[in-house]
Amino acid sequence: MSKEVIVESFELDHTIVKAPYVRLIGEESGPKGDVISNFDIRLVQPNEDSIPTAGLHTIEHLLAMLIRKRIDGMIDCSPFGCRTGFHMIMWGRHTPSEIAQVIKSCLEEIAETTTWEDVPGTTIESCGNYKDHSLFSAKEWAKLILKQGISDNAFERHVI
């Protein structure tokens, strides 16, 4: 007997979302009552644009550090294969508005003050593809995303 599996991200109608946005995909409770929250951090409009791998890779490394400086409980923030944003997994319950504020603050730091020396994990020892980074691209994309504003609603623009 095979188990039916539904992958939420493949059920989402990507033609009706309005990026950039933060969307709560769902919350799950563990056997001891612990809660994790899963977020869709969509930075560019699906099927219209994508962030080049080097820029996305650098944003990924920076977010790994910058998010943790701003909020407790981040488990992981990993890029989508389509290169339009990230999945972010958090301990506990959080609102899209709260996470959108954190992402906005991180992107502001990337766009305005980040230098190459600030990017963590860019050596052969600390990164599995250390040559594929671009701070220039990361900064330019951060500026473009911030110019559009980050919404806390995937379907109606509500810029925070």
Curated annotation (Swiss-Prot):
Reactions catalysed according to its record: S-(5-deoxy-D-ribos-5-yl)-L-homocysteine = (S)-4,5-dihydroxypentane-2,3-dione + L-homocysteine
Signal peptide bounds: none
Single biological process term from Gene Ontology: quorum sensing
A Pfam family per the record: LuxS
EC number: 4.4.1.21
Principal EC category: lyase
SUPFAM superfamilies: LuxS/MPP-like metallohydrolase
Cofactor(s) annotated in UniProt: Fe cation
GO molecular function: iron ion binding; S-ribosylhomocysteine lyase activity
Free-text remark on how the cofactor is bound: Binds 1 Fe cation per subunit.
InterPro entries, per database record: LuxS_sf, Metalloenz_LuxS/M16, S-ribosylhomocysteinase
PANTHER family: S-RIBOSYLHOMOCYSTEINE LYASE (PTHR35799:SF1)
Subunit structure comment from the entry: Homodimer.
Job description of the protein: Involved in the synthesis of autoinducer 2 (AI-2) which is secreted by bacteria and is used to communicate both the cell density and the metabolic potential of the environment. The regulation of gene expression in response to changes in cell density is called quorum sensing. Catalyzes the transformation of S-ribosylhomocysteine (RHC) to homocysteine (HC) and 4,5-dihydroxy-2,3-pentadione (DPD).
Family: Belongs to the LuxS family.
Protein name: S-ribosylhomocysteine lyase
